[in-house]
Amino acid sequence: MCDQQKQPQFPPSCVKGSGLGAGQGSNGASVKCPVPCQTQTVCVTGPAPCPTQTYVKYQVPCQTQTYVKCPAPCQRTYVKYPTPCQTYVKCPAPCQTTYVKCPTPCQTYVKCPAPCQMTYIKSPAPCQTQTCYVQGASPCQSYYVQAPASGSTSQYCVTDPCSAPCSTSYCCLAPRTFGVSPLRRWIQRPQNCNTGSSGCCENSGSSGCCGSGGCGCSCGCGSSGCCCLGIIPMRSRGPACCDHEDDCCC
């Protein structure tokens, strides 16, 4: 639990409110300060060896910040507020530093807590998310940050459903067309993806295709392959198709 002496100490000009995230528990707090914003120290509770303090610094013209508790294995804090504000969040050792940067048009760079590796997310206008999933050790899962919806200023932490229990997959770039070799492919599937429960396919053949419901749609890759790109359907077997020796994930 947080020490009584380490509770948030807000400047006299700051007013504690009940903004986004504050209703999730006593670990959340919403603070609104007039320009120029001051640096706040917020006490959050987390299981060992997670720290109990998160230091949050935000810049002008930010006026409202919301402290949001993120998923296990570390209960840390993100700050949500409108662009073009930037956030610098530091978790003392052994947790790693997390940087969240949201300039227009919704581009994000995130470093996940140990033992997770980095996750890079780029959300070009109009805020379409492209995610690279990364390796994580148990009980950690790969994280990503979802781009804000239209008209929304919030961002939040969620886990990759294909990552549990902390398997490995790699970023897959779209292949070039007209017979040119792809830039990169999925080179390792997340665990248990051959069941199709996570939108992944293995040894699927002509009747198996990666879709939102798993393996089961027909996509014209021929008798020995499966379309597996998600956003660009292939009409013939090519770099986006899976064979019996391939594993792919949409």
UniProtKB/Swiss-Prot annotation:
Skin-specific. GO terms for biological process: epidermis development. Signal peptide: none annotated. This is Protein KPLCE.
